[in-house]
Amino acid sequence: MARYFRRRKFCRFTAEGVTEIDYKDIVTLKNYITESGKIVPSRITGTNAKYQRQLARAIKRARYLSLLPYTDLHQ
């Protein structure tokens, strides 16, 4: 039986040396929300707790300012 090898998750923000996640950086924030608009949990993305809190805050600010949609499921 072959064992499935899962690539080790790492925090992209720690690797790049980011000090603060900017709510105006929509391209980066879109990588951390699902198609339905939910914030992706850190156990999936591998983001550290410190940056996950900053990420959630930045996404919520961007949503409030209409830079990001709350949901994409409008029909």
Curated annotation (Swiss-Prot):
It comes from the Bacteria. Coiled coil: none annotated. Pfam families: Ribosomal_S18. GO terms for biological process: translation. Keywords: Ribonucleoprotein, Ribosomal protein, RNA-binding, rRNA-binding. GO terms for molecular function: small ribosomal subunit rRNA binding; structural constituent of ribosome. InterPro entries: Ribosomal_bS18 (IPR001648), Ribosomal_bS18_CS (IPR018275), Ribosomal_bS18_sf (IPR036870). One of its GO terms (cellular component) is cytosolic small ribosomal subunit. The keyword Ribonucleoprotein applies. Part of the 30S ribosomal subunit. Forms a tight heterodimer with protein bS6. Binds as a heterodimer with protein bS6 to the central domain of the 16S rRNA, where it helps stabilize the platform of the 30S subunit. NCBIfam families: S18. Belongs to the bacterial ribosomal protein bS18 family. This is Small ribosomal subunit protein bS18. It comes from Shewanella sediminis (strain HAW-EB3).
